[in-house]
């Protein structure tokens, strides 16, 4: 092989590596955009401006609430209400209660899902605590609000006619903990 061939091969491999790294960083935002647009996997819509729906539907829907905690996170996490009955377009405020059961300050973060998945695109969150780091001091208990509504178009979609119950499920995961004695962050 000539020096020119080796140089071309090296540049090609370097370009391939750089492209793969860039694609790996771009894949999460691209996937999130895909899920928002299509409602894939129960991804909900998120209201970017606090504009409340003025038009209300007529078909009652039951919203059930679920809470899960990763085994590595010593928190108690429960919905304050097990379920509510609403109509599309009705703004609703519910709370989840979270308590740090450990002797250390801990930062956690949550993800959510709406089931059945096909209805996720009609579940509009106005405010929630998901995807934001939450610091709970040792023994601290907090209420975390979620404000949402079901888009009025839910009633018009023939695929939603059989749905009477939606479930909003949150799962909390440990990000890191801060040792009470040393004040240092301990990574998960």
From Swiss-Prot:
Q: Provide Cytoplasmic-side residue ranges.
A: 1-8
Cite the entry's keywords alphabetically.
Cell inner membrane, Cell membrane, Copper, Membrane, Signal-anchor, Transmembrane, Transmembrane helix
The organism's lineage is: Bacteria, Pseudomonadati, Pseudomonadota, Alphaproteobacteria, Rickettsiales
Gene for this chain: ctaG
Tagged with keyword Transmembrane helix: yes
Q: Which organism does this sequence originate in?
A: Rickettsia conorii (strain ATCC VR-613 / Malish 7)
Mind telling me which residue stretches traverse the membrane in this protein?
A: 9-31
Which membrane topology describes this protein? Single-pass type II membrane protein
Q: Which Gene3D superfamilies match?
A: Ctag/Cox11
The task this protein performs is described as:
Exerts its effect at some terminal stage of cytochrome c oxidase synthesis, probably by being involved in the insertion of the copper B into subunit I.
- Cite the Pfam families for this sequence: CtaG_Cox11
* Family under the similarity heading: Belongs to the COX11/CtaG family.
Give any Gene Ontology cellular component: plasma membrane
**Is Cell inner membrane given among the entry's keywords?**
yes
The record's section on InterPro entries has: CtaG/Cox11_dom_sf, Cyt_c_oxidase_assmbl_CtaG
- The stretches that face the Periplasmic side, renumbered to this chain, are 32-188
A single GO BP term for this record reads:
respiratory chain complex IV assembly
- Its name, as the record gives it, is Cytochrome c oxidase assembly protein CtaG
């Amino acid at each position: 092989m000539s020096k020119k061939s080796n140089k071309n091969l090296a540049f090609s491999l370097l370009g391939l590596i750089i492209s793969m790294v860039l694609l790996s960083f771009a894949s999460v935002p691209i996937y999130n955009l895909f899920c928002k647009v299509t409602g894939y996997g129960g991804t909900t819509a998120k209201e970017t401006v606090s504009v409340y729906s003025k038009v209300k539907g007529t078909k009652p829907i039951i919203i059930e609430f679920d809470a899960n905690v990763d085994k590595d996170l010593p928190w108690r996490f429960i919905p304050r209400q097990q379920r509510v009955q609403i109509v599309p377009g009705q703004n609703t405020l519910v709370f989840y209660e979270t308590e740090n059961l450990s002797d250390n300050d801990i930062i956690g973060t949550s993800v959510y899902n709406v089931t059945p998945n096909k209805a996720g695109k009609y579940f509009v969150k106005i405010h929630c605590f998901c995807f934001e780091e939450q610091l709970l001091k040792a023994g601290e208990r907090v209420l975390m609000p979620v404000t949402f509504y079901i888009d009025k178009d839910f009633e018009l979609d023939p695929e939603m006619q059989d749905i009477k119950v939606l479930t909003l499920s949150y799962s909390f995961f440990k990000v890191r903990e801060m040792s009470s004695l040393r004040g240092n962050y301990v990574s998960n």
